[in-house]
Amino acid sequence: MRPRTKARSPGRALRNPWRGFLPLTLALFVGAGHAQRDPVGRYEPAGGDANRLRRPGGSYPAAAAAKVYSLFREQDAPVAGLQPVERAQPGWGSPRRPTEAEARRPSRAQQSRRVQPPAQTRRSTPLGQQQPAPRTRAAPALPRLGTPQRSGAAPPTPPRGRLTGRNVCGGQCCPGWTTANSTNHCIKPVCEPPCQNRGSCSRPQLCVCRSGFRGARCEEVIPDEEFDPQNSRLAPRRWAERSPNLRRSSAAGEGTLARAQPPAPQSPPAPQSPPAGTLSGLSQTHPSQQHVGLSRTVRLHPTATASSQLSSNALPPGPGLEQRDGTQQAVPLEHPSSPWGLNLTEKIKKIKIVFTPTICKQTCARGHCANSCERGDTTTLYSQGGHGHDPKSGFRIYFCQIPCLNGGRCIGRDECWCPANSTGKFCHLPIPQPDREPPGRGSRPRALLEAPLKQSTFTLPLSNQLASVNPSLVKVHIHHPPEASVQIHQVAQVRGGVEEALVENSVETRPPPWLPASPGHSLWDSNNIPARSGEPPRPLPPAAPRPRGLLGRCYLNTVNGQCANPLLELTTQEDCCGSVGAFWGVTLCAPCPPRPASPVIENGQLECPQGYKRLNLTHCQDINECLTLGLCKDAECVNTRGSYLCTCRPGLMLDPSRSRCVSDKAISMLQGLCYRSLGPGTCTLPLAQRITKQICCCSRVGKAWGSECEKCPLPGTEAFREICPAGHGYTYASSDIRLSMRKAEEEELARPPREQGQRSSGALPGPAERQPLRVVTDTWLEAGTIPDKGDSQAGQVTTSVTHAPAWVTGNATTPPMPEQGIAEIQEEQVTPSTDVLVTLSTPGIDRCAAGATNVCGPGTCVNLPDGYRCVCSPGYQLHPSQAYCTDDNECLRDPCKGKGRCINRVGSYSCFCYPGYTLATSGATQECQDINECEQPGVCSGGQCTNTEGSYHCECDQGYIMVRKGHCQDINECRHPGTCPDGRCVNSPGSYTCLACEEGYRGQSGSCVDVNECLTPGVCAHGKCTNLEGSFRCSCEQGYEVTSDEKGCQDVDECASRASCPTGLCLNTEGSFACSACENGYWVNEDGTACEDLDECAFPGVCPSGVCTNTAGSFSCKDCDGGYRPSPLGDSCEDVDECEDPQSSCLGGECKNTVGSYQCLCPQGFQLANGTVCEDVNECMGEEHCAPHGECLNSHGSFFCLCAPGFVSAEGGTSCQDVDECATTDPCVGGHCVNTEGSFNCLCETGFQPSPESGECVDIDECEDYGDPVCGTWKCENSPGSYRCVLGCQPGFHMAPNGDCIDIDECANDTMCGSHGFCDNTDGSFRCLCDQGFEISPSGWDCVDVNECELMLAVCGAALCENVEGSFLCLCASDLEEYDAQEGHCRPRGAGGQSMSEAPTGDHAPAPTRMDCYSGQKGHAPCSSVLGRNTTQAECCCTQGASWGDACDLCPSEDSAEFSEICPSGKGYIPVEGAWTFGQTMYTDADECVIFGPGLCPNGRCLNTVPGYVCLCNPGFHYDASHKKCEDHDECQDLACENGECVNTEGSFHCFCSPPLTLDLSQQRCMNSTSSTEDLPDHDIHMDICWKKVTNDVCSEPLRGHRTTYTECCCQDGEAWSQQCALCPPRSSEVYAQLCNVARIEAEREAGVHFRPGYEYGPGPDDLHYSIYGPDGAPFYNYLGPEDTVPEPAFPNTAGHSADRTPILESPLQPSELQPHYVASHPEPPAGFEGLQAEECGILNGCENGRCVRVREGYTCDCFEGFQLDAAHMACVDVNECDDLNGPAVLCVHGYCENTEGSYRCHCSPGYVAEAGPPHCTAKE
């Protein structure tokens, strides 16, 4: 648990801990008992405690009106952050109710003030404006008891007394400073006028503005740009969106804005109407387009100016405004939305929230009340799966992971509270019938809203996601009491229980404000939009004149202030700015003017929204952006309503930048082994874990991959670009690829099929009735046909038609259509319950009976000769278009008369009465009537109740007093000191009583106080008196006990107990006792109360040579020292004569007994070791004979010096002298040589040193020379002439012994990523690459099936989509239809292709003919290469075949009719055998890898794709497209072996180093292996001194100059090895023969055993019968003896080196046998080849049947011919040539092949003899 920290407000310490706020929960209620409630259900004092200012329609009361009470059970505190002028003086009687006009006039306090601490979120009055004082009723001068009198305009009174500290001038605060609340320190700056728009006062007269504001008092709104979450584009923030006071009604939920402009300076507030068009006319036309997921707000923050103005760069709490519950709530302007993509918010599992609550309360003392606000701890909460509860803070926070549309509110993790006009899980469905109530979701949220709590809603981005234009948004809802405010600091996503590093949500690039953020965003739900002619003109920003018809250049964005990315063709300004352009111009480019959110007719001109253009004076037509050239590079453009989207072709997908299409092979999830080397026909050196081909081949690590050993493609080839589109060193993660899909909504899945057309999409069905729609081919909208948005049925869908509409000739006033449009008029049926176009066929037709269902909607249709008229039902009115009936908003007439909140409903309304009123219903009329609270019992207990309008007040009786809550409270007379001076005062309602005190008490000031008896002398003698309430108690001293009445102490007779003095005589005394006459071995203790044992061991001299053990009354000597033993009596230790013991010995000396030990007297030159052995004296341990330039080595009776480099031995080898290197030759080329002690110096520049190889001055690698001390735990990086220290290995890496950071291969766990994907290790992490049809799970550790039916919109058109494992099927609902995959819809059976009568009978198609399929590779003769056998013509010619059949008929070309007949579904698709449904053949993707087998991709692995396949070459191979196969890649041409010799092999290479260079970790560089042992701690772990002579078990004559391994020492001139003098095996022993590998070869050669040519012989596993360790436990190794040559065999191995060979003919009666001979494996070893013996690698029996190559981190093996490397065991295993070369018949014709160790033998059949050439047997001649 992290320590609790205390947040501090400016200038005062937090005095009350945050734990005091524990009672907070999701639905806490403040304790009742207050006199009355304010209009939103909160309690407030009665009468004149506060004047209530009201908002129209039940808005929040003014901040000055609401008295909010805390949870601390103290006197309640007023709202924090209010100016003193806002706290009205109390008065008697009822408050004056504002008139209707006044109630409708929003006050300044209503507009700008919130219940929050002043230093945090208070909004001040703008510069130059005065806050209107609340209207108060005149109150009598009589003040109320306990209520402070406050001046209306007086500033905060400074504390009394003289101030000290900072900013103090003359005992008072300096100008510009004031004291902070509850402190006496002048640390609070003053800004007059105050900072506006929630700006904070940083220093005197210096405001720090929030984002989006500027000015000296933050009064100016910055014309910045905000990302529109709904339309997924950056749009200019208009006046209605910038206002900090913007509110949206939560009851209506239809997008209506209710806000007021700021009042003019010095003028009272006046009612304002919202500007026209502030919300899009179709912003909520269909909820399915309001996608929820990624969203982002991008704001530009200005820098500080010269006017002492500061600007905050902090990210604002969210794209919308803070939301509080109550009757009116502020919600974000738009619903958070995302492109058509996966809803990433659903995958959020664990979220962290960092917030700070603020608590305000009022404390009153001595008639003075003070307001105190304190900030709680900055608290971090975690939410698992959407719910979180922190027991420390008492908060319960939930996250809304679902979208609540149409004004709905999230009340749980997966639950929305919907308004009256919508229903569904997301509030996305309209109410089916106007008179039907919403589904039962009202009870719980309604009770929630009426609770005396506040709900704060914050919409914030997840702060630890990667920065992008569309970060995930999370809505955080917090319910809390009104006196608390919450500030959210951070919302971060936590993965896997570990808190990841945070990433700032910043966007450095600025896209154009009206360009779609990404492909896939659709701005409108219909291709046609009407202009709203019934609304006032909407003010638009001034735009440059647009000359019609003038063509110019259209630019998409700007780069460094210059227009960039122009389109390929010239366009008009309207076409450019209305579609994808951001700038336009002919000679000079200018920004495009902003577009309206919906069609608006202004000054007779039609302004169309983004993505639409004018069709005529009243219609806007969708712009087909896909006609613009170059819009979707390497992708297909799909036009949408008001926008477009780019989709990649099959087999491709968008890369993470969403700017280009890459092959889906780049995120293949298939895993396999990655091989670092290739041998002849096989892969070698595989990595330990399976990885993807991308990781293997794109990272330069592997040469081949997969079970088929597929060679990695060469860089620059098409195959390389497919899997590595980003080049070497980069791969794509599947999580980086966003599929251009979205989940279908519930109503879309249940929607009936609709016809498909040529265009992208049509209108969606209406909410009232579901009926098929037609796809719009050329759509437009008419002005004046959209119903009012107040209608609950409006704003859902705009039905589109495919032709021009007929005009209503009734009351609709619209211009006629052109004649050419009228000529095409046809009858059209349209659902009237949605936003429709009223269409007619021809005049004279009865429209009311033309088949449409209730044309007028909620009304009666009256047919007229030239049209029709609608007579609306009660509660409805005629729409301004005169075409149908819409809901009448009765609330505009205030039917509730200011006594309640009016909620308009479809065809009716409802009054929600304020507290103090009750609802009275009379027919269709509702009104609020006053409640007579005085009729309720106990309302004014102790007083008289007087009812008032909407409230009541109490007149208190005698003995009672009016409290601030409006109740009569009994006066406690007992509080006065003079009441009952000689007794106890008992208060009673309205009076009191005096009672006499009990015993032990006395009267004092009306109370009975305890008498302290302990003050009386003599009480509790021999004890301690403890006063009790009304009595006392005695606690006795030791030796005394309490009397029975506990009022005294008496002596205890300790001698009465046998436990006292058990070993002596007991004598009782007063309060104690004494012991005497103790037994033998005991003595009396110091206090005389016991006979204690006498510890003899404490006396000196007892057991001097042993351990004295004390016993009861005695002691004994035990555990005698070495050389001593206990005496017979056990009371002493006596000496032992060790020289008498035959087991004791003094090896090499004379034994002499001593007291407690013995001595070994050694001869001269030896010294005693271990007390028993005389060893040679090590002179090197004494004086430094060879120091300081040599190392002293002891010898038998002497020593010699091993001189350091640069010194030579002198004086008979007993000293070292310096060698002057500069005297011989100048070793410093390009520098000056200076001889030094033991060396020389080349004078070079700082940071450089002479190279030991060239003598030139080269850079000093400080990191290598000095190692870890240079940078400690950090990583050292060398630089020319210097070095730098950087942080060590990053997470996901571990440090290798050489200091390199090596990636941790998480994919070592085979279960990672499951069975439908494979793990792809990346640098520092890993990713799961899933198979086709699968996607990565939310955990990221496995692959799950992709439900294409949910993610792909209308993938099967009108057919039913059925998801299957890894794919999906399209099924028609009717058995009489079949799905046409080419056209994408269901059609009647037999409509195309073969008719039903022609279809074959039965359920299966006839079996096709199968023959051989031939490839057409270059360099091969036609029909010479069989690609596959037993294939059909479709399987051959529709895939990779060139010809087919016995006649080798050529396959038709792809553009021929014959090819279309054989392959109707195209190349890569073949008919499904047996799938014959109603006469139609089903086609599927051809799996070429299965059809043609391994022959399709030799030296590689075949991977099937849809359609086609790819060859994943083995490591060391690359794909040759011309030959269609994997060919060997010559790594030696890529400089794969640095400082060594590279030898290319089939599929791999070998790097050989010249001594003393060895291979490094990469296996591609030779480096110096003679580094210091400090750099290589385990490099020479098996290197030590080699001793040439061993005498008397003493090693002598060490091998001078270097150290060796155990095998090197014993097999050359040594007899013992290492400091432990490990003896070598005898040279005549079998162990020596095995160790040095010499005698065995000679013995076997003498026995006539011949060895295979080209191979060096080494012992096998069966030959090692001796212990694998030497005598001292050190390992010994095989040693390869000198190479030898013997006569060549009769049949040489074809893989060996060619030479003249003479056949050896055996007896004709016996089968010939090939017997290999021992020859040199490399007649001429290549230069740089490290021909090391196995033991030189410092390994144990390693690399048998091969050479050991020692590298820095260990060793590797180069196997002899006939053997191959088993990388798992690092051993060379035999190659079975008889099975490896396609069977023994190839090797031994007319005989049989027998495999041998490292070779093989051919046994010829009778009548055949061995042939000298190929390994065959020929007939005898």
Curated annotation (Swiss-Prot):
PROSITE patterns: ASX_HYDROXYL, EGF_1, EGF_2, EGF_3, EGF_CA, TB. Disulfide bonds join C191-C201, C195-C207, C209-C218, C400-C410, C404-C416, C418-C427, C554-C576, C563-C589, C577-C592, C626-C637, C632-C646, C648-C661, C674-C696, C683-C709, C697-C712, C698-C724, C848-C861, C856-C870, C872-C885, C891-C902, C896-C911, C913-C928, C934-C945, C940-C954, C956-C968, C974-C985, C980-C994, C997-C1008, C1014-C1025, C1020-C1034, C1036-C1049, C1055-C1066, C1061-C1075, C1078-C1091, C1097-C1108, C1103-C1117, C1120-C1133, C1139-C1151, C1146-C1160, C1162-C1174, C1180-C1192, C1186-C1201, C1203-C1216, C1222-C1233, C1228-C1242, C1244-C1257, C1263-C1276, C1271-C1285, C1289-C1301, C1307-C1319, C1313-C1328, C1330-C1343, C1349-C1361, C1356-C1370, C1372-C1386, C1413-C1436, C1423-C1448, C1437-C1451, C1438-C1463, C1489-C1502, C1497-C1511, C1513-C1526, C1532-C1542, C1537-C1551, C1553-C1566, C1586-C1609, C1595-C1621, C1610-C1624, C1611-C1636, C1737-C1748, C1743-C1757, C1759-C1772, C1778-C1793, C1788-C1802, C1804-C1817. One of its GO terms (biological process) is supramolecular fiber organization. A motif (Cell attachment site) lies at residues 375-377. Residues 280-292, 304-314 have a biased composition (Polar residues). Residues 262-274 have a biased composition (Pro residues). Residues 108-120, 129-145 have a biased composition (Low complexity). Residues 1-35 form the signal peptide. N-Glycosylated. Contains hydroxylated asparagine residues. Expressed in the aorta (at protein level). Expressed in lung, weakly expressed in heart, placenta, liver and skeletal muscle. Keywords: Disease variant, Disulfide bond, Dwarfism, EGF-like domain, Extracellular matrix, Glaucoma, Glycoprotein, Growth factor binding, Heparin-binding, Hydroxylation, Phosphoprotein, Repeat, Secreted, Signal. The modification Phosphoserine is found at S506. Residues 744-757 have a biased composition (Basic and acidic residues). Residues 38-58, 81-165, 229-339, 510-544, 744-772 are annotated as: Disordered. Belongs to the LTBP family. This is Latent-transforming growth factor beta-binding protein 2. The lineage of its organism: Eukaryota, Metazoa, Chordata, Craniata, Vertebrata.
